[in-house]
């Protein structure tokens, strides 16, 4: 077939491009129509410290009245593929291998979520490459590491340790000992029983909110404002340290 003014090689290229666009659109539409979530549940014997390693799953750990550990995974899939999960190990060292299967020319849903219900006294250690992490109401400690993703710690009573390469970190907990470090992301800590808080960010704002008491405070921003709005006494046993290279630092009390 010849089209006046368009050479045959150019026409072939245009036809191929049009076909690819059509296939992409049709495939993506079919993917959306057939999108669904598959759920798996497994139980493990309890461990004093539950250790989780994942590739790209969102991980949520909640304290419960269970005597064992229940793990629920939700895999988002479609006709063309999607998220797949394989668990290996036990509660003391559980490895979650999550990956995506699908067609490279189709926008396919691929997402994995993981929920762990653990005894209240449990401590947790989580290491994820990409994904959000959330820990709630543990009486033990939380040691959370994320390459890319936001981290949320709510109601944890034991020591809190968070390391994130890229992502915001929010902590609202009675934990007396809290340490947060992020390369890129904001840090917000509301500590109702603060004894020692260390917060550091290469790029991002840091906000600390603590009870209306006296603290030894080390707050510094290399390129931003730093405001200390609490009672300061360098001899206080309660230590607050907040450093950021680029961003603001605010240390305030929860007093009205």
Regions found by a protein language model. Name each.
Residues 8-28:
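Hydrophobic membrane-insertion alpha-helices, especially the h-region
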Residues 56, 75-77, 130, 148, ...:
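Beta-strand elements of well-folded, non-transmembrane domains
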Residues 40-41, 58-63, 84-86, 113-117, ...:
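Short, T/G/N/S-enriched strand-turn elements that build extracellular solenoid repeat scaffolds
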Residues 160, 168-256:
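Short, surface-exposed interaction patches in beta-rich subdomains
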Residues 1-9:
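Terminal targeting segments of Actinobacterial cell-envelope proteins
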Residues 11, 30-93, 113-117, 123, ...:
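Short linear S-[DN]-x-LW-Φ motif typified by the pepsin-like aspartic protease active-site region
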Residues 44-45, 109, 235:
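Membrane-spanning beta-strands of outer-membrane beta-barrel proteins
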Residues 97-183:
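Non-cytosolic head/periplasmic domains of membrane-anchored proteins
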């Amino acid at each position: 077939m010849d089209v006046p003014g368009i050479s045959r090689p150019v026409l072939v290229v245009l036809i191929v491009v049009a076909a690819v666009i059509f296939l992409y659109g049709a495939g993506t539409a079919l993917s959306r129509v057939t999108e669904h979530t598959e759920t798996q549940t497994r139980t493990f014997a309890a461990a004093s410290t539950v250790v989780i390693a994942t590739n790209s799953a969102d991980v949520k750990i909640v304290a419960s009245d269970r005597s064992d550990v229940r793990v629920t995974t939700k895999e988002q899939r479609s006709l063309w593929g999607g998220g797949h999960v394989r668990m290996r190990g036990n509660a003391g060292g559980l490895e979650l291998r999550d990956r995506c299967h699908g067609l490279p020319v189709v926008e396919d849903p691929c997402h994995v979520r993981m929920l762990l219900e653990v005894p209240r006294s449990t401590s947790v250690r989580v290491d994820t490459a990409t994904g959000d992490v959330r820990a709630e109401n543990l009486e033990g400690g939380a040691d959370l590491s994320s390459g890319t993703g936001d981290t949320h710690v709510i109601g944890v009573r034991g020591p809190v340790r968070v390391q994130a390469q890229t992502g915001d970190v929010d902590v609202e907990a009675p934990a007396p000992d809290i340490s947060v470090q992020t390369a890129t992301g904001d840090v917000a800590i509301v500590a109702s029983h603060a004894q020692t808080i260390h917060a550091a960010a290469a790029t991002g704002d840091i906000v600390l909110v603590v009870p209306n008491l006296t603290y030894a405070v080390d707050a510094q921003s290399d390129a931003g404002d730093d405001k200390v709005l609490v009672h300061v006494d360098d001899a206080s046993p309660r230590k607050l340290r907040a450093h950021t290279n680029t961003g603001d630092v605010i240390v305030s009390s929860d007093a009205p």
